[in-house]
Amino acid sequence: VSVRPEIQSEDAGAENAAGGAEDSDDVVPDERERSLLAEGSSFRYEYADGSFAVDAWVIVDGARYYFGADGLAVAGRQKIEGIWYFFDDECRMQTGWVTWKNGTKSFFDWDGRALTGWRSFNGVKYYFDPSTAMSLRWSRKLDGRWCYFDSASRMTKGIVTWKDGTKSYYDSRGRETGGWVQSDGAWYYFDWSDGKAVRWHQKIDGHWYYFDSDYQMHTGWLKWDGVQKWSYFYSNGQQAFGTQIIGGYRYVFDSN
């Protein structure tokens, strides 16, 4: 994948990621006399005996380089022994956040390895695709459940309002869910079949409810459009039927 990144200076520590700054066990500074030789836009690494580094990690002046099968230092996004790494234009291995041109992100740990799967940074969760090490955005299905990540790849919790005005709800683990949800003092009901909030007159678990144009459950009196009829919805949202005493007055509600 050839994607030129924008390197961020964002300083965030990943939970479950190593936080040390010591050298990786796989990268050991070479104690022999060494020489970094420029070749085109890359480099070769020559040992004192005249041989060159091939398929090898080398540390020079504190910077880490990887020399491929052709003996040239690699640059850009590279997969080495199944792990993604990133090297700048000078072929130096990078750590920390990288934002790609398509808006996704990768995080390279202290040893340069890209993190994958679920990761948390300062309390914000991200999911990095195990096959690409790039963060997910928008609606994605993970482990059989829909999740939503915003434009910055951050996992979303709570109510999301879509462009068409419909709403979905994501629980504390970021999973789309259904059922009753209270938010900012209002009650909503999310259909389990599609995860969307319901509106208007709805029968739920054997009781009738009414949800307004903003998907919020209605309580109190409701006058129906186009007819001279009223209904009453208790504080729990359930519609009144039959003979009821409300506010000291007797009312009779038909079965419709």
Where do the PLM segments sit?
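Extracellular adhesion/carbohydrate-binding repeat motifs centered on closely spaced tryptophans
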Residues: 1-256
